[in-house]
Every structure is written in C-alpha cells, then in structure tokens.
Amino acid sequence: MGYTEVAAAPPSMAAPPDPQFVLRGTQSAVHALHFCGGAQEQGHQLLLSGSLSGLVHIWSLQTRRAIATLDGHGGQCVIWLQTLPQGHQLLSQGRDLKLCLWDLAEGRNAVVDSVGLESVGFCRGSILARGQQRWMLAVPGRGSDEIQILEMPSKTSVCTLKPEADAKPGMPMCLELWQTDSSPRPCLLAGYEDGSVALWDVSERKVCSRIACHTEPVMGLDFDSQKARGVSGSAEKALAVWSLDEQQALQVRGTHELTNAGISDVKIRPDRKILATAGWDHRVRVFHWRTMKPLAVLAFHSAVVHCVAFAADGLLAAGSKDHRISIWSLYPRS
C-alpha cells in the first residue's frame, strides 16, 4: 500500500498559517532543537537550540529571547540536545567528539561531566531513562558501523553493537532507544547509511530484524511505541512507514512520495496525531500520522531546515540553515 502526494494541495489542505513567532539571534545555522519544562524559568517552557557555531541557546518562549548561552563544544557544530529525566540536566552532542552534561539548576550553566565520542559523523545520540538518576545512552561507536551503549552517569560501557558478519549497512545515521511497557529489555532502532532500519535487542546484542526502507542514507526516524509503528526519511524523495510485530519483525507498510528530495529530520507529535518533517527544500511538511495524509506545507525558511521538535503541548519548532527558528501552533491538541 503506497501513499502518494499530489502536486497541488488537496482541497482539505487549508492555506498554511504563518509562524506564531520567530526566534532570531543564533547568528549561525540551527542544527538541534529540544523543548523542556523550565526549571529555570519558574515553570515556563524553554526551547534549547544547538548551532553550527558550537553554541547552545536557551530560549524563553514567554519573552521570545535567549536567556542563556552555553559554550562547550569549541566552535564545533552541536547536533543533538536532550534533557534528562530530572529536568535540570542537559546533554549536548557536538562534532568536537564530545558529549557534555550540563547542570542548569538555579540558573547555572556549567559542564559537570563529558563523554568522549569515537565518531565525528552526524549521528545523534539517544537516551532511555532507567529511573530518575540513571539512563542508558546510545552513540556511534569506534568502528564505522558500530553503536556504543553506555550506562550513565557512570559512563560504564554496556556493550558495542556490531552488525552481523554478512551485513554491510555502513554507518549508523540515527538512533532511537526505547522499551515496551511489558518488558524491561531495552531495544534500539537504528537507521543506516545503506537506507536500512534495524531493530536491536540491546541485552542480547543482536539484530532482531532489518528492513530496506530507502535507497539513500536514513537521515531521521521516529517511532510510536504505542502503535508499534515508525517513520523514516532519507536523502531521497520518499518517507517510509514501517511497523513492528509481536515477533519483533519490522515490516515496511508504505512509502509516501514527496515533492522534493531530502529529509533532515522527522518527529511524531507526543499525542501521536501528526508528524512533521524538516526538508532540504526549505519546507516543513505536516502529515496526519495514522493516514499519512498531507496536512500542511510550512514555507517560511529560506534555506535547508535541519531539525524539528514538538513540545509536550503540541507546539512545533523548526530550525534552519537561515539562522532562524520558527515556532508554529498547528492542529491544537484536543
């Protein structure tokens, strides 16, 4: 079953809105975005952005200004940001082969720890909370096709995931750690350079399933663990939708043709109603998650959109090479 996007907007696709507001001031391409509840801002929501210049900006969505700037990556691009379960700690991953742990409590902005990385690629890390104080971290490993799993904050190596001897998937490009409610066993979804997506059983260090989703490197993926369904984008002109059955087998459910090639990032909204893609064609595209029906094409940016992020309340942020971050309120959560 294939989904096909028509060239013209379908009658049900209303004229796209303008951004609710725009954040300016990074003075550099925006490569990473992450929303967090504001420990610093008396409960107000904050947006974190990582830029090509190596800086992390912390934005107040109330004042629409940066309230702090973190400089921990020696001028090298920041490609991933993630707050930890307790809220006031932040992980930032840069192309300086370093993952920094920041303490943001009470207005602090100090690096309290760091992890040396083995790979300089653009593969963002992933975490899985193991209670309030511990979490599992997946990052690209030393070998070009390897993934390293660490227990944090102890930095203890759990294992290295190496592809099967006969598989040649190339480099991991994107990672997603998760676990089902019914099982404590952590799983990892990895998108690879050859266009495949693999499901790893981390405890067993083995690939449960691998599917060919794309003919180009997988640039972004997201997974809906409640529906056991995921979506991925690549350098080509299609999104792939795939599912996971009870036997841990991945299956491609359909492909959705895009108007233009190249997806940098894809995110499913927390309520699992819609998803957004960041496009090389300067566009953010919004789809209905269950049907993959196109809902909106957001044409605000003047250069590649590198990243998208959803807040818990449904607000959407997009970061671009044009140095701007656009904030959108779409299809309010019911």
Predicted feature residues:
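A structural motif specific to WD40 beta-propellers
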Residues: D18-Q20, R65-A68, A110-V112, V158-C159, ...
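WD40-repeat beta-propellers
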Residues: V56-S60, L99-L104, I147-E151, V197-D201, ...
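A short helix->beta-strand "capping" segment at the edge of beta-propeller domains
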Residues: Y3-S28, T63
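Blade-level signature of beta-propeller repeat domains, shared across WD40, Kelch, NHL, RCC1
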Residues: H306-S334
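Loop/turn segments within WD40 beta-propeller blades
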Residues: L33-H44, L81-G87, S126-R134, L175-R185, ...
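WD40/WD-repeat beta-propeller blade-loop signature
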Residues: P19, A29, G43, A66, ...
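Conserved strand-to-loop turn within each blade of WD40 beta-propeller repeats
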Residues: G50-S53, Q93-D96, P140-G143, G191-D194, ...
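WD40/WD-repeat beta-propeller blade N-cap
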Residues: L23-V30, D71-V78, V115-F122, P163-P172, ...
